[in-house]
Amino acid sequence: MTWPFENDTSNIEKKLAKRSLHHERQRNLFAIIALVLTAFMITATFSIGFSYFETYQMQQIRLMGTTADVGITNVTENQLVEISKSNLVLDVGIQQRLGSVDTEQLQNARLGIVWIDDTEWEHHRLPTISGVVGNYPSSKNEIMLPTWVLEQMGISDPQIGMEIVLSYQIGDSYNYVSDTFLLSGYYTDYIPMRTNNRGYVYVSSAFKDSLNVSLDNSVTAMIR
């Protein structure tokens, strides 16, 4: 009951209550949106940061040409055994430089003839290259080359099994010999950007074992 001298404020109170509830809902909605946007920005920032770090890390690994952390040159068989036993070592790959290629007919490449074992190839080298076609050499007369070397040889469309003639020397000999090899594989590598066009001609274990020269001081342990 409302007396004559009283004002009926019930409708006003209801309107104020509804308006207050509406504003409260808006504030809650804005708060939720702000939280969602904040969470999104934080997640996006971390994602971009991690992606940048991973990209940078991959670029550095590719420029180095191996995932190994350190290389120890001129190691002996006994030293290799002791290194492999260490709890601090994840794996050990073997690299052996056998000789070099006569690159006088090429533009500016400097190529070493190199053999690496399965660990070095699969765990240290493969992660740093791309566009791999074919396989690592297995026969005595097989080689594997990076595409930039093939291009300097005038080969723009390499084919597995194609013949490639190389003039090369082995060990400390200054006598160059010429042989015809078969291309077992090719790939894209990135170390020439760091090494001023130094590269590798990968050869097989069979080729290495066929050499009648001492290569005792040419073994490098690649440690990760």
Where are these regions (language model features)?
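Feature of multi-pass inner-membrane transport and sensor proteins
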Residues: 1-30
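Basic-flanked hydrophobic alpha-helices used for secretion and membrane insertion
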Residues: 50-224
